[in-house]
Amino acid sequence: RSIDAVDKAGLRPLKINAVIMQDVNEDAILPLADFCLDHGYQLRFIEQMPLGPKHTWDRNKMVTQEAILAELRTRYTLTPDTDGDATAPATLWHVAKDTRQPGGSIGIIASVTAPFCATCDRTRITSDGQVRNCLFAKSERDPRSIMRGGGSDDDIVEAWTAEHLVNAHAHGINDEGFVQPERTM
């Protein structure tokens, strides 16, 4: 119902995110693509990332960008979208069933197998208001303490910018020695 409401309100582009997990929903790749393409929505597959609170992520059970693309290619013709935003996390693909039938686009956020850290221009805010330069950052800034301490807007901007500038430009998720931050988003 939520998707229908957003669609009826005319909010576009409507993007639907899906995390495909081995032995859970691998069979949903093509039905999700069909649904989104039929309705003019942009589907974005996201590689499963080590974000859960119980540190249960297993790299060997992750469905990769290549596996998703291979499944999509069984039904669709995929052409890379070379006009996209270079800082966007998703790699976009133009999708068509055949040359006579217009398709749409599908994005894949492959933050594990094809990290985009070097071009990332994002910061994150945790549920309790801390600022991080990456989902996997171990350091945070606390703008609330600046506000509560009487700091100015410029002080907040300075702290936020400082956190963003310490971005290591590599989270190392796909490295053997990767350690998930103790505190999750």
Spell out what each predicted region is.
Residues 52-172:
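Accessory C-terminal segments flanking Radical SAM cores
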Residues 13, 42, 120-122, 130, ...:
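Intrinsically disordered, low-complexity sequence elements enriched in Ser/Thr/Gly/Pro
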Residues 175-185:
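Intrinsic disorder and flexible/low-complexity segments
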Residues 49:
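Active-site/acyl-donor-binding loops of N-acyltransferases
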Residues 1-46:
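Radical SAM/AdoMet-radical enzyme domain recognition
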